[in-house]
């Protein structure tokens, strides 16, 4: 989604309407040339076979127009399935899984060896573009143990971590070589202990470290609702300041995503998007149309320098 417009309904488009959408995309095709776009891959898009393929095609499309996509993924459903299979469903505290070293080995295997490899394969059906990576590779992420508070008491979740540092140099090398990095969110601490990192948090931190133009979060809802589950409370755009004010009252499942968006914007990312990953090609619909399909967070007045009209001029960003 891009400024000064409200979301559009993409269902039931006639050929004439589709041609209009393609023409509308031209200024955005020019705008994203050489720009890094970090996409957090999650939700139904990771489970449904058609959505997986549509997402992979979107990443190849972005590369084809000269953009520089980077994918960050989690794998909650796949991890749950694996742990159930091996009989390690485990303990929960405050709604969070306690990740023992044994559980962490399966988490690591699923994220990098299954989810990441599958997406790399789907992208590479279109050409030799994607390269799998993890937070362990070349010091990409450095983590520390994350503690939570439950009923006023600090709780140890085991190998659940938070990012302390990002060294994106290795990914920049891949991006400069025309590759699409697919990043699994496991990371070591300074003692070599491996932690599972929230993929939303990792995507936001990585977008900031890379100097990305955009951060895109795939979810299983249409965007940000200020009063979930009231469907009338869906917003198409808001500023970081407005989002900060809303944060304490948002649905708990949306909070990590919104915190990651705010962190990315504070680090210089131009805009963040929350979109419905249940819609095929949702990334392209959001970024390549003026209406978009989700919620965009951007600074006040940003629309004045991001109007599609000026993007025909190569002397402007």
Curated annotation (Swiss-Prot):
It is an enzyme of class 2 (transferase). Pfam families: AA_kinase (PF00696). Its EC number is 2.7.2.8. SUPFAM superfamilies: Carbamate kinase-like (SSF53633). The record marks 40, 257 as: Transition state stabilizer. InterPro entries: AceGlu_kinase-like_sf, AcgluKinase_fam, ArgB, Asp/Glu/Uridylate_kinase, Glu/AcGlu_kinase, NAGK-C. Substrate binds at residues 75-76, 97, 196. Keywords: Amino-acid biosynthesis, Arginine biosynthesis, ATP-binding, Cytoplasm, Kinase, Nucleotide-binding, Transferase. It catalyses: N-acetyl-L-glutamate + ATP = N-acetyl-L-glutamyl 5-phosphate + ADP. GO terms for biological process: arginine biosynthetic process via ornithine; L-arginine biosynthetic process. CDD domains: AAK_NAGK-C. GO terms for molecular function: acetylglutamate kinase activity; ATP binding. Its main location: cytoplasm. GO terms for cellular component: cytoplasm. This is Acetylglutamate kinase. The gene is argB.
């Amino acid at each position: 989604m891009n400024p000064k417009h409200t979301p559009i309904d993409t269902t039931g488009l006639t050929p004439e309407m589709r041609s209009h959408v393609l023409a509308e995309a031209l200024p955005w095709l020019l705008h994203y040339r050489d720009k890094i776009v970090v996409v957090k891959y999650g939700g139904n898009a990771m489970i449904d076979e058609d959505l997986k393929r549509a997402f992979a095609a979107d990443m190849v499309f972005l590369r084809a127009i000269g953009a520089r996509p980077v994918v960050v993924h989690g794998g909650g459903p796949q991890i749950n399935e694996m742990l159930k299979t091996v009989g390690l469903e485990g303990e929960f505290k405050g709604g969070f899984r306690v990740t023992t070293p044994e559980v962490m080995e399966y988490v690591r295997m699923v994220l990098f060896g299954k989810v990441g490899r599958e997406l790399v394969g789907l992208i590479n059906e279109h050409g030799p573009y994607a390269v799998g990576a993890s937070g362990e590779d070349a010091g990409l992420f450095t983590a520390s143990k994350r503690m939570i508070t439950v009923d006023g008491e600090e709780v140890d979740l085991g190998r659940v971590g938070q990012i302390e540092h990002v060294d994106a140099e290795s990914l920049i090398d891949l991006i400069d070589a025309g590759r699409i990095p697919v990043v699994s969110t496991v990371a070591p601490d300074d003692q070599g202990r491996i932690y599972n990192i929230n993929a939303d948090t990792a995507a936001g931190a990585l977008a900031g470290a890379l100097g990305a133009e955009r951060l895109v979060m795939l979810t299983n809802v249409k965007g940000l609702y200020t009063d979930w589950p009231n469907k009338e409370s869906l917003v198409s755009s808001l500023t970081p300041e407005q989002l900060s004010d809303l944060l304490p009252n948002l649905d708990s499942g949306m909070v990590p995503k919104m915190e990651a968006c705010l962190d990315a914007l504070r680090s210089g990312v131009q805009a963040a998007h929350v979109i419905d990953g249940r819609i095929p090609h949702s990334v392209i619909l959001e970024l390549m149309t003026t209406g978009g399909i989700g919620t965009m967070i951007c600074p006040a007045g940003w629309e004045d320098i991001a109007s599609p009209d000026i993007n025909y001029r190569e002397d402007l960003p």
